[in-house]
Amino acid sequence: MTKQTIRVELTSTKKPKPDPNQLSFGRVFTDHMFVMDYAADKGWYDPRIIPYQPLSMDPAAMVYHYGQTVFEGLKAYVSEDDHVLLFRPEKNMERLNQSNDRLCIPQIDEEQVLEGLKQLVAIDKDWIPNAEGTSLYIRPFIIATEPFLGVAASHTYKLLIILSPVGSYYKEGIKPVKIAVESEFVRAVKGGTGNAKTAGNYASSLKAQQVAEEKGFSQVLWLDGIEKKYIEEVGSMNIFFKINGEIVTPMLNGSILEGITRNSVIALLKHWGLQVSERKIAIDEVIQAHKDGILEEAFGTGTAAVISPVGELIWQDETLSINNGETGEIAKKLYDTITGIQKGAVADEFGWTTEVAALTESK
């Protein structure tokens, strides 16, 4: 595809920036956003960076009615020597197109969109917080915009990228969380949209999450939608268990999202010479491992939290305290290594980080 010039319109009124030590997750947004449109007769066109602003859309826009939308999530960091770094952004672009395919959304030019993302981050670089546990969250997403109430794929779309300075996703930070195994609701089934990053997957998880939070849990552990026996994900993260020295994560089966942090964790564990298995793992196996005293660690992995240790797991009437409710050695090492690579403090032996070039002109 021919690369299109990205036009830039800078804001005339900059917003006040939040205290980096008081950041929550996803409540504050930067001065600018990236936008690109699609029409069936034109393809993707008019890539632009403009001041952050509301959208004006027809009430019949198909995204409102049939949920034809996909999104991604990644982060930008400032290194100690003031370089802006992204973590494996090309994988997010690749996965966005995989989600597009599942949702009948036209493929994007991954290099074009990544270039727009980099330029946007460079323009709003001053919004990247540098306090411990903070980052600039990047949310690319695509919505169906055609005003039509028929059930079909839209002929027009809008791609946007917005930025948000964030603190830790969970108030616990790297401290272990309590999770409940979900036995009533299911997240996804094979052949559905579980392996796509689309809004409906998250909307359908809210009820189970609400019930869990009312009982004092941070997240739910999802089981498969057929037998309600095999472990799939934890909340919006992939899940790992360390059982008798073996680190196990559910194999990708069409209903589990292929996490970029998950892939990075597997690569690191193998690099460290540890035994890693991607396979089916039943909740009964985890319960039995706990009874046998060989359930050593459990942790979730994802862009938002990076690594989230599980300190307590509740299944029916059983409460499993994992590693005495403390962060495990592997989880801590993974967290320190990945966040270190992301911020340029740990050598990047895998070539995972991408530097965002500084603007040649002052904003």
Curated annotation (Swiss-Prot):
Enzyme Commission code: 2.6.1.42
Keyword set includes Transferase: yes
Keywords carried by this UniProt record: Amino-acid biosynthesis, Aminotransferase, Branched-chain amino acid biosynthesis, Pyridoxal phosphate, Transferase
Pathway: Amino-acid biosynthesis; L-isoleucine biosynthesis; L-isoleucine from 2-oxobutanoate: step 4/4; Amino-acid biosynthesis; L-leucine biosynthesis; L-leucine from 3-methyl-2-oxobutanoate: step 4/4; Amino-acid biosynthesis; L-valine biosynthesis; L-valine from pyruvate: step 4/4
Purpose of the protein: Transaminates branched-chain amino acids and ketoglutarate.
NCBIfam families listed in its UniProt record: ilvE_II, PRK13357.1
Listed name of the protein: Branched-chain-amino-acid aminotransferase 2
Organism annotation: Bacillus subtilis (strain 168)
Gene encoding the protein: ilvK
